[in-house]
C-alpha cells in the first residue's frame, strides 16, 4: 500500500448511517440512563457489525463510520488542547434546515492532546479489521479552525499566530496516528468549500493563502509511507447542503500546490461546477489521485451507469484515467442524524461504486 495505490479506484469518504442500536444507546447516554462504559461497549459492537457490512459490500477501504461521533468535526476539535465545545444560540443553517446548536472555539493556547480519544478509537478499529481490509481514519482539516468564530476569542492577537499552533498540533497528530499504526488518514475540509462559495469577498485571497499554508506545513510532516487524502465538502446534513460554488477560485492552490495523496471531490450536481479546474493538477508534481464524487450520498436513487461512465470519460480530458477514482460524493452521515435513506439504500450505493469502478478500471 503506497500513495501510488491509494486511494483505490473505488473508495469511500468515511461516514455511514448510524445503526438503530447505536442511536438508542446514544439517546440513553444523553438521558443519563447509560454509563460511558456501557455506551462504549455498544459502540464497539456496532462498529464490528459495520466493518463486516463493509466487507460484505466488497469494499477494500474500511472505516468506523464515525460511529463514535455526533459531528464529523467537532468531536475531534474539542479534544485538542485549547479548543472547547460550546452551545451557541443557533446551529449551522443548511438549505431549509438547521443543525443542533453546538460548535467549537479557542479557549487557550492550542496544542495536540496526547490523550486524545481518537487515537484509542483508531486502535480499536485497527484491531477489529485486522488484515481483512485497509483501515482508513478521518479527521477534520486544520482549516476548520480558521473561521473568526473559532479563533478570534481574545487568546491570540492574530490568525497567523493561532495558525502556527494549529499547524504544530496537526503535525503532532499525524505522528500520533502514525505511531498507532495509521497509514491512511483523511482531512475532511469544508473551508475550501466555503472559499468557493465566498470567493468575491475582500478577504478571499488572504483566507486562501492561509488555508494553503496550513496544508503545506502540516503535510511536510507526513511520513513517506503514510497516505493522507482530503475530502472537499460543501456541507452534508439530512440530505441538504450548506454551500455552493465551483472549484475554479481555489484550484490553483488546492489542486496545483498541495501535496495530498488523494482528493475526494464532490461532483454529484451543478453546485460543484465542471471538470475544467482539474487542469491545475497537471502543475502539481505530486500526482495525487483525484476521486470523483459522482455518486450522491444524499439521495437513495441509483444514478444512470452510462451517465457516470460518460462523466469519468469527460474528466479524462484533464487527467489520465489511471489518476482518477470513483466514490460517493460525501459521507452518508456527516452528523449522527444521517442522510434521508435506508441502510439498504446506502449499501446499494456503496456496491454501485464498486461495480462501476471494476467496469472502468478493472480490479485494484
Where are these regions (language model features)?
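Domain-level signal for soluble alpha/beta catalytic cores
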Residues: 1-364
Amino acid at each position: 500500500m503506497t500513495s501510488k495505490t491509494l486511494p483505490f479506484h473505488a473508495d469511500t469518504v468515511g461516514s455511514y448511517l448510524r445503526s438503530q442500536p447505536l442511536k438508542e444507546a446514544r439517546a440513553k447516554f444523553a438521558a443519563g440512563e447509560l454509563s460511558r462504559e456501557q455506551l462504549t461497549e455498544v459502540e464497539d459492537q456496532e462498529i464490528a457489525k459495520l466493518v463486516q457490512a463493509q466487507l460484505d459490500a466488497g469494499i477494500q477501504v474500511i472505516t468506523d463510520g464515525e460511529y463514535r461521533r455526533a459531528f464529523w468535526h467537532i468531536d475531534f476539535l474539542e479534544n485538542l488542547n485549547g479548543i472547547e465545545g460550546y452551545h451557541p444560540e443557533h446551529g449551522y443553517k443548511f438549505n431549509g434546515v438547521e443543525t443542533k446548536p453546538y460548535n467549537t472555539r479557542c479557549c487557550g493556547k492550542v496544542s495536540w492532546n496526547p490523550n486524545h480519544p481518537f487515537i484509542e478509537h483508531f486502535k480499536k478499529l485497527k484491531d477489529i479489521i485486522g488484515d481483512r481490509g485497509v483501515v482508513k481514519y478521518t479527521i477534520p482539516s486544520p482549516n476548520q479552525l480558521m473561521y473568526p468564530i473559532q479563533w478570534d476569542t481574545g487568546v491570540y492577537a492574530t490568525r497567523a499566530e493561532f495558525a502556527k499552533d494549529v499547524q504544530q498540533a496537526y503535525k503532532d497528530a499525524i505522528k500520533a496516528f502514525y505511531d498507532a499504526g495509521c497509514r491512511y488518514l483523511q482531512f475532511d475540509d469544508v473551508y475550501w468549500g466555503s472559499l468557493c462559495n465566498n470567493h468575491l469577498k475582500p478577504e478571499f485571497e488572504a483566507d486562501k493563502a492561509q488555508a494553503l499554508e496550513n496544508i503545506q506545513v502540516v503535510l511536510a510532516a507526513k511520513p513517506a509511507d503514510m497516505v493522507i487524502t482530503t475530502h472537499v465538502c460543501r456541507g452534508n446534513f439530512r440530505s441538504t447542503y450548506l454551500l455552493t460554488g465551483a472549484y475554479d477560485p481555489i484550484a490553483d492552490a488546492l489542486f496545483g500546490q498541495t501535496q495530498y495523496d488523494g482528493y475526494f471531490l464532490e461532483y454529484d450536481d451543478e453546485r460543484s461546477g465542471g471538470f475544467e479546474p482539474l487542469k491545475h493538477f497537471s502543475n502539481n508534481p505530486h500526482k495525487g489521485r483525484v476521486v470523483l464524487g459522482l455518486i450522491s450520498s444524499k439521495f437513495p436513487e441509483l444514478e444512470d451507469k452510462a451517465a457516470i461512465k460518460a462523466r469519468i470519460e469527460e474528466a479524462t480530458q484533464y487527467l489520465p484515467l489511471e489518476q482518477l477514482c470513483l466514490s460517493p460524493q460525501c459521507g452518508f452521515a456527516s452528523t449522527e442524524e444521517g442522510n434521508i435513506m435506508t441502510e439498504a439504500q446506502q449499501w446499494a450505493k456503496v456496491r454501485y461504486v464498486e461495480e462501476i469502478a471494476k467496469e472502468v478500471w478493472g480490479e485494484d
